UniProtKB/Swiss-Prot annotation:
UniProt name for this protein: YcgL domain-containing protein PBPRA1080
Source organism, top-level taxon: Bacteria
Ranges where the YcgL domain occurs: 1-84
Gene3D superfamilies linked to this entry: YcgL domain
Coiled coil regions, renumbered to chain: none
C-alpha cells in the first residue's frame, strides 16, 4: 500500500497521510482549514515499514476506511509538574 504524506503549514509536527497524491477529497473541509496548506513530504510504501510516531496498521486501516490518517505530535510532558509531584511524594 502506497500513501502520500503531507505536513501541516499551521501545526508543528502534524502530518496527513492520504491514499493518492494531491487528492484531498476524503479529508473534511474543517480539518483542511485547521491543517492549513499541505506541504508534500513523500510517497511511502507502508508494507514492511515501521513509523516513528504512528502504528502502521492503524494508518493502513484508517486509509482503507476513512481515506486519510492524521498524525499529531505526542503531548508535551511538563517536567516541572513531574518534579514537583516527585518532591511532594518524598516529603509525605
Amino acid at each position: 500500500m502506497l500513501c502520500s504524506i503531507y505536513k501541516s503549514s499551521k501545526k508543528e509536527n502534524t502530518y496527513l497521510y492520504i491514499n493518492n497524491k494531491d487528492d484531498f477529497s476524503d479529508v473534511p473541509d474543517s480539518l483542511m482549514g485547521t491543517f492549513g496548506a499541505p506541504q508534500f513530504v513523500m510517497v511511502l510504501k507502508l508494507e514492511g515499514r515501521k513509523l516513528a510516531l504512528a502504528d502502521v496498521e492503524k494508518v493502513k486501516e484508517s486509509l482503507a476506511t476513512v481515506g486519510y490518517y492524521l498524525q499529531v505530535p505526542p503531548p508535551v510532558t511538563n517536567l516541572l509538574h513531574q518534579y514537583k509531584a516527585a518532591k511532594a511524594s518524598q516529603t509525605s
